[in-house]
Amino acid sequence: MRSTIRALTSAVVLAAGTILTAAGPAHADVTICDQFGSTTIQGRYVVQNNRWGSSAAQCINVTSTGFRITTQQGSKPTNGAPLSYPSVFLGCHYTNCSPGSTLPMQVSRIRSAPSSITYRYVGGTFDAAYDIWLDPTPKTNGVNQMEIMIWFNRQGPIQPVGGVTGNTSIGGRSWQVWQGNNGSNNVISYVAPSPITSWSFSVLDFVNDVRARGLITTAWYLTSIQAGFEPWSGGVGLSVDTFSASVSG
């Protein structure tokens, strides 16, 4: 989320912890404390620490199927941006592309885009959310023009970018819809009324809803499917236990 701020944040190497700066494969549990450190799992997904909004320490333990936050020392005002977005993704994020990914792919070519996730929650102020990025060009670096967020959980007095525009039903679930702009890209957020811990769904259903609202066209490109947490405070123990995503044309 909020890619412009991420792009302007310089990398800070922590003095302690395992430092992973390249997206190398994770064969056993590894710890990432580097600000933008990442690694690959299952030979197809990238897990990233992505501590873009703070200089405070954050570490994640990466497993073969996901990750867990093990250190989180920062705190941010709840009326502003979060500390970070530790996450797992398929596709490309600032030139870091998952192995063998079919993304970017033009929306008109996409026939299926299934995804599934299992979250584990603890205390703190955070959201648990998918971050789905689209752009008019097949961009693999920089800020995309459209951000779709799917909030599976919201804890504390935090809210998405923009304001409420209504409610909708997607994938057999009800969602409160928010729309806005964070200064660099448009954002549409779908907020669940109560926490979701596990779900299998079609990313394409959300993309099609955004298209029906006139915010994108079928000529746009899906560039990445990401899932993780945005903590404002606390969060040690939050985890993505399992994640899967694929896009086929």
Where are these regions (language model features)?
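Long, compositionally biased interface segments
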Residues: S194-G249
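Secretory targeting and sorting signals
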Residues: M1-A28
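Ser/Thr- (and often Asn-) enriched beta-sheet segments in non-cytosolic proteins
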Residues: T31, T40, G66-T70, P104, ...
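N-terminal segment immediately downstream of the Sec signal-peptide cleavage site
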Residues: D29-G80, G249
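Short, hydrophobic/proline-enriched secondary-structure or compact coil segments at domain edges
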Residues: F67-T71, R111-T118, Y130-I132, L222-P231
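Short helix-loop boundary/capping segments
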Residues: P138-L204
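Short, surface-exposed beta-strand/loop "edge" segments at domain boundaries and coil↔beta transitions
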Residues: G74-Y85, Y121-T125, K139-V143, T197-S200, ...
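Extracellular-facing segments of soluble proteins and assemblies that are Gly/Ser/Thr-biased and enriched
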Residues: S84-T165
